[in-house]
Amino acid sequence: MIRFILGRLVKAVFILLAILVFNFLLIHAAPGDPAAVMAGEAGAADEKFLADLRARFGLDQPLYMQLWLYIKGAVQLDLGYSFRQQMPVAEMIGDRLPATLLLTGVAFVLSLVLGVTAGVAASARQGRWGDTLISTFALLFYATPLFWVALMATLVFSVWLEWLPGFGYSTIGAGYTGMAHVLDVAKHLVLPASTLGLFFTAIYMRMTRASMLEVSRLDFVKTARAKGLTRGVIQRRHILRNALLPVITLAGLQAGQIFGGAILTETVFAWPGIGRLMFEAINQRDYNVILGVFYISAAMVLLFNLITDVIYVIVDPRIRLTT
């Protein structure tokens, strides 16, 4: 297992390096002069001031040298300096990352638990009203745009009913500490986490249902029924364990989509995470922040995929541990 994990880590390093190079070249291929943006308005500053800015941020060097310096800094977690916020990018991301991990983590667990549970329930009631009802809701959640769900959730539960706060990480100026602070954050987390998780709940539900029905038709399940095992035992020990394999694979692949969905969710709910930081950086053309968020997001996705591979091996020991 250790050799397997080390092999995956080596591959992840090379993949991350390729992502760094691609994102760097993509950002620098965009039209516009970063130095002019730093000056406040394009063309508003004289050439000497723009030249000083280019020299300060290394923009006067050849592209290959800028790329080398960026990769060298990224290895040391030195992601550059934000000219807009006047602070290191690594510090900015470090301040925002816990909020994003909390949001995406809760949304991921919520969607996985609800999706698998609903999928199992639907497969057990195939062709009946329960299956139809669950499948209809899953299709509805899957087809509805995320931003519309976020806006409607805010309008209904925050504006009309006033049950839940519609924006922010915690109550401004409340000064809560200890358990009171935890409960306050949890209350603010309900709407964004539920909104982000609904789409993925529908995906996991549909995948679990289809996988459960497929596995239930295999020979070993028929053998288990012939031995007189109860329906619950067959569902839990034989069908569900094998049906979860494609769900686990899908969950690992969609880690990046959850981070992508966090950008929109955090923007609508004013959640202070790296998704909102990315949105602000794009509007301000703060290139170092954009590259820094790309870097951290790619690293997190690769980490999730590694965890998925390990879980896959644990769930199905028949899989060979090859690097």
Language-model features: locations:
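N-terminal signal-anchor/signal peptide hydrophobic helix marking the start
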Residues: 6-12
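Hydrophobic aliphatic residues
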Residues: 30, 38, 42, 74-75, ...
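Residue-level signal for discrete positions within transmembrane alpha-helices
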Residues: 12, 96, 100, 136-143, ...
